[in-house]
Amino acid sequence: QYEPSSGGRMMNSHYGTRSLDPLGQWKNLTSQINSSSDISPTASQMPRLLGLAFASKLFRNNKALDAFTHFSNNGDEVAFGTIGNASTSEGHFFEIMNAAGILQIPMVLAVWDDGYGISVPNTIHTIKESISKVMKGFQREKGTNGIEILVARGWNYPEMSAAFEKAT
């Protein structure tokens, strides 16, 4: 009522690490914790997440990049990302997950599924009401590429910690 443009759904807490110093020069990204900020359109963080993970793989496999030590620790980085369950209904979510499985990149994605997408129940935005069930065809099998799918209850800290440990 008071904010008709978005119905109060403006996500205004998108924070990120500054990668440039005040003079516009690159900082040493390997000596700081780096966070890439989300952007408002749903699932739009997915292409960036893929790019960060693929960059890590390139730094690991391309010796021509060895001189750029301020960007990577020899490609040992893992790109972590998060997405809400309703945003997994966006097409680029599936495109990125397919590319991640093909490229075999160091990427961990947490899907926060509380049964709703902003205010819409899973029954009307996700087939089978579970993105992990939908993604079963992407599951890596012995001798193939693909992705690992781990399921943990977000409110169970030891279970979540174990899942993240296994993922990395």
Residue ranges of each PLM-predicted region?
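Structural signature of the thiamine diphosphate
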Residues: 156-168
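Short hydrophobic alpha-helical runs that function as membrane-insertion/retention elements
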Residues: 106-111, 148-151
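Short gly/pro/ser/thr-enriched loop/turn and capping motifs at secondary-structure boundaries
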Residues: 115-118
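Cofactor-binding active-site loop characterized by glycine-rich and histidine/acidic residues
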Residues: 1-103, 110, 121-139, 144
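Short catalytic-loop micro-motif centered on adjacent basic/acidic residues
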Residues: 81-83, 148-153
